[in-house]
Amino acid sequence: MPATLRQVAEAAGVSIPTASRVLSGRAAEGRIPEATAERVRAAAAKLGYRPNVLARSLRTRRTRTLGLVVTELANPFYATIAGAVEAAASASGYTLIIAASGEDPARALEYLRELPSRPADGLIVAPAPGSEVEAALIELAGAGFPLVTVDRLLPGLDCDRVVTDSRGAAAGLVAALTAMGCRRLAMAGGPDGVWTARERSAGFREGLDRAGLPFSEHLFRSGEFSVEQGRAAAEVFLASPQPPDGIVAANNRILAGVLETLAARGESARNVAVAGFDGVPYAPFLGRPIAVAEQPEAEIGRAAAGMLIERVEGCKDAPREVVLPLAVRTFPPEPAGTEGGGS
C-alpha cells in the first residue's frame, strides 16, 4: 500500500499542510525553511510516497461534471443542500455526481479518490471525521484541485468553504429557552470529532454564561448525530435528581430521539421545552415549547456551487469563507383545550 501524505508528515515531523505545500512545489508560498522542505522530501523518498498526479492532471481536463460528497442524503439538511447544488450546477451547464459517506471515513476516502478519476472538475464535500479524510482533502487542495467544503471546517485545509454560525445559533437557542422560563438546561451534543458539533457545544456553554446559568456535566452528553443519541441522552437527563426543564439537541436527528423519549414519558415530561437545529416542519404541532435554529440549506448549496464553478473556470483568489447566519424561531404550545377547525 503506498504511503500517505499523513505518514510523510509524521516522518518529517511537520503538519500535513506543510508536507502538502512542499510536495506540490509551493514551499516558498508558505515560507517554509529549506531545511524543513528537505526533511519532507527525504521522508517522501524513503517512504516511497507518490503524489496525486491524477488530481493535478485534471486541472487542465474539463468534463463539466462536479462531485458532491455528503454524510447522508436521508437527512433533509443534506438533501436540500444537494438539491440546491444540482440546480445551480445545471443552470451553469454542469452535471452533478452525488455520493453519501454515512459518516464512515473509509467510504469518504473511497469517494475522494474515485470522484476525481471519473473525472469530476471539482468537489463539494461535507467532510466525514478522521485524519485520513483530512489528509486526502489537503492533498487534493494542495494539488490545485477545485474544492469547497460545506457545514464543517477542517484545521489546515486551505480551500473555499461555506459554513453557518453554529456557535451563535446555539447561544441563541439557550436565550430562547430561558425566555420561555427554563432554568435547568441540558444538551444532547454531537460527535466530539466534528467541528459543527464542537461549535454548537461551545455556543451552548456561552449561552449559559450569558444567562447566568451553570453548566452541569450530568446535563451534557455528546454522541453521534443520531436518533439513538437523542433517546439515550434524554433518558439520562430525565433520570437526574434535578432533571432539566429544557433540552438542546445538536441536530434534527438527535432532536427526534429526544422528542421520542419525552413523548414516552407522557405527562411527567410534558412541560420540558426543547430546542434544535435544521428545519423542523412539525414544530408548531408538538404541543410543547420548542425553539429551532433554521439553517439556510438552499443558500449553503447555492453558495458552494457558485464558488466551485468559479474555481473550475479559473478563479485564482485566496481561499474564501462564507459564514451564513441561522434564524432562531420559537413555537409555544397551543393553549390546553383549544381545537383547530376548518372546512
Predicted regions and their residues:
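Hinge/beta->alpha junction and helix N-cap segments in small-molecule ligand-binding domains
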Residues: 53, 70-80, 98-107, 129, ...
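Flexible loop/turn connectors
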Residues: 235, 239-343
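Residue-level detector of anion-binding/catalytic polar loops
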Residues: 15, 50, 90-95, 121, ...
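N-terminal helix-turn-helix DNA-binding module of bacterial transcription factors
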Residues: 1-62, 338-342
